[in-house]
């Protein structure tokens, strides 16, 4: 005796036990069910066949319309989200371009600062050399002042001698 089961259960049964275990051919009925040998159903302890419930054309149309409405809502939502994503992608690209420009500007600023630092270093070296020269010049001036002081002392002595000579 053959029993009716759904197409889905039939395919599951075929996957589970393999086609070679069936003695008969698959029989398709007009209501979407298929027939298989009852022995195979009992052997593999499958659930009893599903009873098929019929719906009217009007009920099916209502179901279809409600699904269409849900799909339209989903499509609208997805379209809006897609638009938002597209806008965000454009904003990200703009930000990347702006960030790249800022990076280049920052590089130029850093290069300028480096050049200024190099110039300041050179000026510092020159200032150090000038300070050394100033120190040497101060040393020379000190020597000259010492000589001048010595010369003044000598001149004072000479003046005293001259005064002595004149007074005589």
Swiss-Prot record:
InterPro entries: DUF16. SUPFAM superfamilies: MPN010-like. Belongs to the UPF0134 family. This is UPF0134 protein MPN_524. It comes from Mycoplasma pneumoniae (strain ATCC 29342 / M129 / Subtype 1).
């Amino acid at each position: 005796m053959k029993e009716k089961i759904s197409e889905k259960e039939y395919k599951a049964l075929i996957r589970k036990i393999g086609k070679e275990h069936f003695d008969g051919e698959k029989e398709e009925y007009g209501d979407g069910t298929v027939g298989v040998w009852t022995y195979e159903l009992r052997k593999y302890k499958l659930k009893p066949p599903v009873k098929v419930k019929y719906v009217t054309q009007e009920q099916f149309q209502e179901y279809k319309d409600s699904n269409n409405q849900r799909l339209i809502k989903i499509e609208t939502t997805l379209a809006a989200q897609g638009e938002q994503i597209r806008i965000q992608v454009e904003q990200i690209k703009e930000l990347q371009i702006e960030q790249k420009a800022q990076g280049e500007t920052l590089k130029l600023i850093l290069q300028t600062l480096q050049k200024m630092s190099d110039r300041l270093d050179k000026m510092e070296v020159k200032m150090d050399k000038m300070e050394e020269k100033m120190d040497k010049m101060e040393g020379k001036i000190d020597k000259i002042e010492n000589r001048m002081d010595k010369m003044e002392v000598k001149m004072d002595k000479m003046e005293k001698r001259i005064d002595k000579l004149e007074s005589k």
